[in-house]
Amino acid sequence: MKRIILLSLSLVLVYSQKMWGQVNFFDAHVSKYGELEQVLGDKWDKIDSLIVHGPINEADFTTMWKCSFEGKLTVLNLEHAQIENNKIPTRALFKVDRQVIDDPRAYQGVVYLPIRHLILPEGIQEIGDFAFSRMRLEQVNLPKSLRKLGPFSFSSCHWLSTDPLIIPDGITSIPPQCFINCQCFKKLVLPSTLKVIGESAFYNTRIEEVNLPEGLEKIEQGAFAGCNIKKVIIPASLNELPGFLFSMCPYLKEIYIPNHITKIPGSFASWCPLLEKVNIPKSIIEIGVDAFAGDVKLKPIDLPEGLKHIEQDALWYCAIDSIVFPASLEYLGGGSCANWKYIKKIYSLATIPPYCAEDMDNPGDGPFHGYTPNDVPLYVPIGSGEKYRQAFGWNYFTNIIETDKFPTGIVSPKMSNNEQCKVYGRDGKLFIEFPNTPACPVRYSVYSIGGTMIEQGYLTASHTLQMPSRDTYIIYVGNAVYKILM
């Protein structure tokens, strides 16, 4: 019987070895910095899984790098290690002089370190520049003690699939290109302590969902360009928008911009083929070069009174079917309204035609050309028709009509039934009250009975507005319309 049991155990061990392969695990105990290489001895190039106990420094990280680059190490557990100065050293596991080489193992000219799983210890406060760049890293933890990330610290870890990726509370800045080209995680959770997101920090990732926390003060150029984000609500704490912020986001459908922003910068959300909704706040005075260029589904664009400049190619190739240029408009950049193949009517409220610049890419053409038909009705104020017919850019149109009847209504997005609000007037004030916090920002606009717009924007909570005089007002909130006598 005993012989049968022993034989069975032997068979199990042999079978397990065949099933799991040659797993070479090593539990290293070090007593001082720089000792890891000595402790590993001649096993350094045979280990594929390593746990380290005790103090480690930059020299020990170089040893671990060697175990992976020149050996077989793919799993590294540092949860029991004490890292010198609580900081992962700069280029801890990325040696550019050894990895950027002509080598059969190279991917896009770089040999990626084969470590796939990395466990970091609680207690570390900083991860240095390029510390884990260009690795085949799939899983990593960011300890709660972490307070600082270095530029490029996880750059081009294409296979990073820790999902969701949670940036710990206490982090105030995500530096430039920190997670650029990390393409396998879909949800990003940012902390309430975050103040700054650096240039291209999440460029060309596959993020579908991200929270931009209230308190965020600065986002730099291209931070989320090339992502898979579907919807964005920009927090009110942000006072300025950078260029290329959401450019080339192929699944982006909706953007909410807070009401105090004054400029939509160049290439802000260009080449977003599914973008359908974006609000232009009443505070906006300029829409930058290529801001929404190539957004072939972007259709409802309400331009606010106060807008002065629409720059080169800003709305190029959008799906606009009608538009109202406000009386405040002074400048239309070349190509800014080109290739509007669905346009049916245009209104320009300015009595003096806004200046039209020549298209730098198509000399001789102005803002309107290409697929924009020249025979659609262009409605202009009474007495200004001849000025428009003589003005460069506007003289593109053959059907200029003088009128004093300009559109005042705004089509509003729908609210669900459980978001219906209460609208009433009292003591010269208008009250818009929601029983619950809306699930997403709700468009509203307030007009006098004569058609003068009083206010418009997006609501995320109940709102009170001091009205200018006793009158009857029309209020649009979501898909509901209210008539209030003040």
Residue ranges and their predicted role:
Residues 1-25:
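Bacterial Sec-dependent N-terminal signal peptides
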Residues 368-409:
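Membrane-proximal C-terminal cap and juxtamembrane stalk of leucine-rich repeat ectodomains
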Residues 23-31, 48-56, 73-86, 99-126, ...:
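Structural signature of tandem-repeat unit edges
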Residues 34-43, 59-68, 87-92, 130, ...:
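Short, T/G/N/S-enriched strand-turn elements that build extracellular solenoid repeat scaffolds
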Residues 412-486:
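C-terminal outer-membrane/trafficking sorting elements
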Residues 92, 128-131, 150-153, 175-178, ...:
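Consensus positions within tandem repeat domains that build extended binding/scaffold surfaces
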Residues 27-46, 454:
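Acidic Gly/Asp/Thr-rich repetitive segments characteristic of extracellular carbohydrate-active
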Residues 20-25, 401-417:
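Low-complexity, Pro/Thr/Ser/Gly/Ala-rich linker/spacer regions in secreted
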